[in-house]
Swiss-Prot record:
GO terms for biological process: translation. This is Large ribosomal subunit protein bL28. InterPro entries: Ribosomal_bL28, Ribosomal_bL28/bL31-like_sf, Ribosomal_bL28_bact-type, Ribosomal_bL28_sf. The keyword Hydrolase does not apply. The gene is rpmB. The lineage of its organism: Bacteria, Pseudomonadati, Pseudomonadota, Betaproteobacteria, Burkholderiales. GO terms for molecular function: structural constituent of ribosome. Belongs to the bacterial ribosomal protein bL28 family.
Length: 77
């Protein structure tokens, strides 16, 4: 399973660890993904999504129905 948020599309990025001596080594910055279930009242069922914390905040702001409509328009759910 890919480490990608289903709502925002956030994925791992690549950067550097930087030591005190300014030595640089490659590292990955992973999104803060959570597996969450949301109850959709309009459909009277639960929907499971793998969302980042930013995706959870977006769902709180717009509502689960609007977010699911966007996902279905993109063909992801």
């Amino acid at each position: 399973m890919a480490r990608v948020c289903q709502v925002t599309g956030k994925a791992p990025m690549v950067g550097n660890n930087v030591s005190h001596a300014n030595n640089k080594t490659k590292r990955r910055f992973l999104p803060n993904l959570q597996n969450r279930r949301f109850f959709v009242e309009s459909e009277n069922r639960w929907v499971s999504l793998r969302v980042s914390n930013a995706g959870l905040r977006l769902i709180d702001k717009k509502g689960i129905d609007a977010v699911l409509a966007d996902l279905r328009a993109r063909g992801e759910v």
